């Protein structure tokens, strides 16, 4: 199993309840995103049209309350399913941690838009690109 865990707090301002992220998954692999408030979203890996390259899959969620703490869990039953993660829409919440240690096959990481937390990538030996 592969898993990414993100601990956040929604902010008390107009845009403070929305989160967006991108995942790159193996073609036809599924990942389950538990948003921490009882809502779950399942996404499926895909390829770019007329190409062998994998495409980014978008996911997003709006939280019901401002100023609350949530733990987002992204997981796949397949250990090698999650190829890339980009928390591009995390700038509208306060991010405390992005835990990647249970996702050893991660190859691409988009790091912009998070808080000032430090990332431990020591358990991600296949990581090729950090943006």
Which residues are covered by each model-predicted region?
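N-terminal capping/linker segments that flank leucine-rich repeat
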Residues: 1-115, 123-125
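Solenoidal tandem-repeat scaffolds enriched in leucines and small polar residues
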Residues: 128-131
């Amino acid at each position: 199993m592969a898993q990414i865990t993100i601990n956040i707090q929604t902010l008390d301002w107009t845009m403070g309840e929305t989160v967006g992220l991108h995942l790159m998954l193996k073609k036809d692999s599924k990942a389950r995103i538990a948003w921490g408030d009882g809502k779950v979203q399942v996404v499926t890996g895909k390829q770019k049209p007329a190409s062998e390259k994998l495409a980014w899959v978008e996911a997003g969620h709006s939280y019901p309350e401002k100023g609350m703490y949530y733990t987002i869990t992204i997981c796949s039953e397949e250990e090698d399913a999650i190829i890339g993660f980009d928390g591009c829409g995390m700038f509208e919440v306060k991010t405390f941690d992005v835990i990647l240690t249970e996702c050893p096959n991660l190859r691409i990481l988009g790091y912009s838009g998070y808080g000032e937390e430090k990332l431990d990538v020591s358990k991600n030996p296949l990581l090729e690109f950090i943006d």
